[in-house]
């Protein structure tokens, strides 16, 4: 197993159980990794096999060498999970803003339905793309609240005006009119 594989395992949370601080250990484990790899390479050079006792001592020595490591904030931890796994494992980015934004709209994306009047939808941008149609181009932003995903068509003028705010993995709140999509059967 190489260093890059260990980085992915740490970022995904797969090694949380190996540390006394659980999920709070990811930053410490990542900081520790170069020393651990160097130490393992040195051991490999010195001897062909280690006893179980020596491995425990090695782990303890390495952990004692790590000092002043800041615990990752929830957002950083979730983004590291997504980077290594392709999805959020221990939660969702939307959970970090859900309570705070319920004052404006408590509507979950799974409960939206076509209505003549617009209403506020909120979530995390999971993807965005430009699609060419017979009528021209349309900008599509996919919003995810951890329970459902919806695609929002954004007019070119609005997309260009707010393009600096429409970033992947960022929270967005959009006043939108929900219509049925006869082509895909969705909304």
Description of each model-found segment:
Residues 19, 92-187:
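Single-stranded nucleic-acid-binding OB-fold domains
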Residues 1-114, 177-179:
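Sliding clamp-binding short linear motifs
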């Amino acid at each position: 197993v190489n260093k890059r594989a260990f980085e992915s395992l740490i970022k995904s949370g797969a090694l949380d159980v190996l540390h006394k601080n659980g999920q709070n250990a990811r930053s410490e484990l990542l900081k520790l990794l170069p020393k651990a790899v160097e130490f393992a390479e040195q051991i490999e050079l010195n001897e062909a096999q280690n006893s179980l006792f020596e491995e425990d001592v090695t782990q303890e020595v390495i952990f004692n060498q790590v000092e002043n490591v800041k615990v990752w904030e929830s957002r950083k931890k979730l983004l590291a999970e997504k980077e290594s796994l392709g999805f959020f494992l221990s939660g969702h980015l939307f959970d970090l803003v859900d309570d705070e934004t319920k004052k404006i709209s408590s509507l979950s994306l799974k409960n939206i339905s076509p209505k003549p009047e617009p209403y506020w939808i909120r979530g995390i941008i999971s993807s965005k793309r430009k699609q060419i149609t017979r009528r021209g181009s349309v900008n599509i932003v996919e919003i995810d609240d951890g329970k459902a995903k919806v695609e929002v068509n954004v007019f070119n003028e609005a997309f260009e005006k707010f393009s600096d705010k429409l970033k992947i993995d960022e929270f967005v709140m959009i006043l939108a009119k929900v219509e049925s999509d006869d082509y895909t059967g969705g909304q």
